[in-house]
Swiss-Prot record:
Its EC number is 1.2.1.41. It comes from Bacillus cereus (strain AH187). This is Gamma-glutamyl phosphate reductase. GO terms for molecular function: glutamate-5-semialdehyde dehydrogenase activity; NADP binding. PROSITE patterns: PROA. It comes from the Bacteria. GO terms for biological process: L-proline biosynthetic process. It is found in: Cytoplasm. The gene is proA. It is an enzyme of class 1 (oxidoreductase).
Length: 415
């Protein structure tokens, strides 16, 4: 039996053990993992350095190297996230609803773990910790399949997690890593219906599209973030400047950063040139339509492909429109249903935007950078879903559960 099948089979067995573990036992395991990560920081950073050096040799972009890089502070941040996770309410066993039928049957809908979660992701080694700990908190076994670019970091982190779990009542194989990073191992994971209850891809558009297209197991789609901000003609100038600069430049390599600004032509005629200059001063490359070029000749003419691209860098597309209807049409045509924002003082336009734009998170007068589990108050997330079934938006702990019905009677039979 090859690695993927063997680990899938073992994960299914472990999932049956995890469902019996108490919240206290799961929290003890999380605390052990946090402590072990701190005590073995030097080992993890040493292995991460190997990934970084190999990435530089392969010519990885600065944004990719940033996603790949770990340091002491990022590991501390991971452990702080685990400590916050411990404090969160365990959704498993929660009564979602309860009622009694006229025939005396008592029915309860209870939250239960999904079972075995598969995670396939790119670069970010922190996802290894996030996925492992969130799955453990919700009583799920997890099979991790990272990319070759982070293989040394991922192997080190999972080894550390295993050493932590050995000190607890949770099985070591509650968290398993597929070390084979070839396409064949990924494709095998896509079709492991006998063992996987759900597969969650987390990465770029190409990875996510491949998983959605080829997987036969149920998929929770964490879509790419081609996010927009529409600046309505009534938008406050300073607010618009501050929000756009934050949403683009604070951390351009993440999925909730914006990739396109859509400007109402009346607002753009007054403030567009100043906004473009402010963005360029911060290293942003602008690609715009003909109307944008007429305002600033240094802007590169945007291609059709640019409108649908998640740049994940300091590149920003600029679209000038004559109405909110044109803005909504552009966003719904090219957006990835992740996060979209409107800056406006016109409540009628805000309401129209909220009703008409199809996305997981819609903002009024705020940065799209808040689409995040911790910022929403969830405390933790496994990803940000851009699909509509099961869950949408930041996926907190309840997203990794299903429900079952518990029916209690005293001898009832159906007539």
């Amino acid at each position: 039996m090859n690695e993927v099948l063997a680990k899938g089979k073992r994960a299914k067995e472990v999932a049956r053990e995890l469902v019996l573990k108490s919240t206290h036992q799961k929290n003890e395991a999380l605390a052990a993992i946090a402590n072990q990560l701190i005590s073995e920081t030097a080992y993890i950073l040493e292995e991460n350095k190997r990934d970084i050096e190999e990435g530089k040799a392969k010519g990885f972009s600065d944004s990719l190297l940033d996603r790949l890089m770990l340091n002491e502070q990022r590991i501390v941040d991971m452990t702080e996230g685990i400590k916050q996770l411990i404090e969160l309410r365990d959704p498993v066993g929660e009564c979602v609803s309860a009622w009694e039928r006229p025939n005396g049957l008592s029915i309860q809908e209870m939250r239960v773990p999904l079972g075995v979660v598969g995670m396939i992701y790119e670069a970010r080694p922190n996802v290894t910790v996030d996925a492992a700990t969130i799955c453990l908190k919700t009583g799920n076994a997890v099979i991790l399949r990272g990319s070759s670019s982070a293989i040394h970091s991922n192997k080190a982190i999972v080894a550390v997690i295993h050493r932590a779990l050995k000190q607890t009542s949770l099985p070591e194989e509650s968290v398993q890593l597929i070390e084979d990073t070839t396409r064949d191992s990924a494709k095998q994971l896509f079709t492991m219906n006998d063992y996987l209850d759900v597969l969650i891809p987390r990465g770029g558009k190409q990875l996510i599209d491949t998983v959605v297209r080829e997987a036969s197991v149920p998929v929770l789609e964490t879509g790419a973030g081609n996010c927009h901000i529409f600046i309505d003609e009534t938008a406050d100038k300073q607010m618009a400047f501050d929000i756009i600069i934050n949403a683009k430049t604070q951390r351009p390599s993440v999925c909730n950063a914006i990739e396109t600004i859509v400007l109402h032509e009346n607002w753009a005629q007054q403030y567009g040139s100043e906004l473009f200059s402010s963005l360029k001063e911060r290293g942003v490359e602008l690609r715009g339509d003909q109307k944008a070029l007429a305002m600033d000749s240094s802007i590169v003419l945007a291609s059709e492909e640019d409108w649908g691209t998640e740049f994940l860098s300091l590149t920003l597309a600029v679209k000038i429109v004559s109405s909110i209807e044109e803005a909504i049409h552009h966003i719904n045509t090219y957006g990835s249903m992740h996060s979209e924002a409107i800056i406006s003082e016109n409540e009628e336009n805000v309401s129209k935007f909220f009703v008409s734009v199809d996305a997981a998170a819609l903002y009024h007068n705020a940065s799209t950078r808040f689409t995040d589990g911790s910022e929403f108050g969830f405390g933790a997330e496994i990803g940000i879903s851009t699909q509509k079934l099961h869950v949408r938006g930041p996926m907190g702990l309840p997203a990794l559960t299903s429900t079952k019905y518990i029916i209690r009677g005293n001898g009832q039979i159906r007539k």
